């Protein structure tokens, strides 16, 4: 079996009809979870942007490890849709309203933060953003934040933005501003929000150009 045949077999398995699940989604486009030539992940970007728009947030920031699979063109059962996010380590969703300066500090601290659980050391561990483009510099031991753009313009440090957060990025924001008002979105998780959006019959949002790495 050559590489193309192996890929087709894998895609067929991912999209095969689950006997336990009757509902299927027909994806019109295909997005890869692998890094693209700009160091972004199209599938992760599509999923996060879909959820951000569903929750009426302007921006979103999430770790890469919540997104686990490519989106394959064609029919896909709801149970397979659930496997596109890390259900075993799912995260609640939070919404905060903070200014551009705090968003800059959030991204800056996320890139620099280091503890026994997680530290960004290579491009594969960069976060997934939506509604904004994060421009980073590659350093000897990781990455530093150079700039953030919203609608192709530098983020307005004084303007207030609504931002969708996961457990991890919410915790980083709390370190920056312990008094910040952050609202948990009920029992909604990243995985349940993604699955619910697809079960409603909509197509995933197009991936965004959300990351730029300067050497």
Where are these predicted regions, by residue range?
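Catalytic centers of hydrolytic enzymes
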Residues: 1-215
């Amino acid at each position: 079996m050559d590489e193309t045949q192996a890929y087709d077999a894998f895609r067929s398995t991912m999209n095969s009809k689950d006997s336990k699940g009757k509902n299927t989604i027909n994806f019109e486009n295909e997005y890869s979870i692998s890094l693209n030539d700009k160091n972004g992940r199209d599938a992760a970007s599509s999923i996060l942007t879909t959820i951000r728009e569903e929750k009426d947030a302007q921006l979103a920031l999430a770790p890469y490890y919540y997104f686990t699979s490519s989106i394959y063109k064609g029919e896909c059962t709801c149970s397979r849709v659930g496997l596109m996010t890390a259900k075993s380590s799912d995260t609640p969703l939070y919404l905060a309203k903070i200014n551009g300066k705090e968003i800059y500090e959030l991204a800056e601290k996320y890139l620099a933060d280091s503890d026994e659980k997680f530290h960004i050391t290579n491009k594969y561990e960069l976060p997934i953003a939506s509604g904004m483009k994060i421009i980073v510099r590659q350093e000897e031991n990781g990455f530093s934040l150079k700039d953030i753009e919203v609608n192709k313009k530098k983020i307005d440090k004084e303007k207030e933005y609504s931002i969708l957060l996961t457990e991890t990025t919410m915790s980083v924001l709390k370190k920056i501003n312990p008094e910040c008002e952050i609202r948990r979105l009920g029992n909604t998780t990243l995985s349940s929000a993604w699955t619910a959006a697809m079960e409603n019959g909509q197509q995933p949002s197009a991936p965004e150009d959300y990351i730029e790495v300067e050497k």
